[in-house]
Amino acid sequence: MGPLFSSMILLASTSELLAACWRNLVLGVVQGLTEFLPISSTAHLKVVPMLVGWGDPGVSATAVIQLGSILAVIVYFKRDLAEVLKGIALAFKHGQWREPKARLGLAIAIGTMPILLAGMAIKLFWPGYEASSIRSLPSIAVVSIVMALLLALAERIGPRLKQMHLVKGRDGFVVGLAQALALIPGVSRSGSTLTASLFDGWQRQDAARFSFLLGIPAITLAGLVELKDAFAELSLEGVLPLLVGIVSAAFVSWLAIDWLLKYLQRHSTWIFVAYRLLFGVLVLAWWLSDTSN
């Protein structure tokens, strides 16, 4: 009975490990597909697991998996980032803050401040944020619909004249304020920044590129903060599933970034407007049917 009992325990633990890896693989794919498309990764990372019966993975788990997306965007834009760092270094050395790359770096720094301050405020003064009604299904559904309508309006009236080399600190601040709204589940960080950029007159592809670059500091900081808490609770068996989620998120995120930039060269954002409206309506209908039963 001893060896048999040990084998049963080993089999059970292996089964649990594989199940955890599968869950994180799915979460990583969902994260990768939705982080950089303007459709809200937070909303999908809450809805999809609940849809398949896994429950809400929580803020910490999703923030850690987001590190895979950060790895992807850093690799994809490594040349841009190198140029920005070089521009900032030259600006500090020679005072050349009017150079495009230096202005881009300054805009990213300024644009990061609103979400950084808002995130700190939530962490310090809203301990019940993760379980609050703002993360509920009806809230996510309504927010998704509202953001779809705003993106539609921006697509309709935005002049689309600005290009990346014209970016200023003021642009970073405006888009950064929109990025801070992404702390509300369903808003979508890429969606809010893309919408604000289109309202502000950016060309679609440049708006997307700036959105991706602007997200690097914010998502990295959020992931690192939650990573500290996650590691405090992490067991040895939890390392592999976590890595599976991060790697799958990185791979799919890279594909999503590449696809979106190419797509926006020749297409509008109407497909995302339609998707977000449909997503919001379906989630709301699901919640209503669930509460009526």
Curated annotation (Swiss-Prot):
It comes from Prochlorococcus marinus (strain MIT 9303). Catalyzes the dephosphorylation of undecaprenyl diphosphate (UPP). Confers resistance to bacitracin. The keyword Magnesium does not apply. It is found in: Cell inner membrane. GO terms for cellular component: plasma membrane. Bacitracin is thought to be involved in the inhibition of peptidoglycan synthesis by sequestering undecaprenyl diphosphate, thereby reducing the pool of lipid carrier available. It is a multi-pass membrane protein. Belongs to the UppP family. GO terms for biological process: cell wall organization; peptidoglycan biosynthetic process; regulation of cell shape; response to antibiotic. It comes from the Bacteria. This is Undecaprenyl-diphosphatase. InterPro entries: UppP (IPR003824). The chain crosses the membrane at residues 57-77, 106-126, 134-154, 172-192, 212-232, 239-259, 268-288. The keyword Phosphoprotein does not apply. It catalyses: di-trans,octa-cis-undecaprenyl diphosphate + H2O = di-trans,octa-cis-undecaprenyl phosphate + phosphate + H(+). Its EC number is 3.6.1.27. Keywords: Antibiotic resistance, Cell inner membrane, Cell membrane, Cell shape, Cell wall biogenesis/degradation, Hydrolase, Membrane, Peptidoglycan synthesis, Transmembrane, Transmembrane helix. It is an enzyme of class 3 (hydrolase). GO terms for molecular function: undecaprenyl-diphosphatase activity.
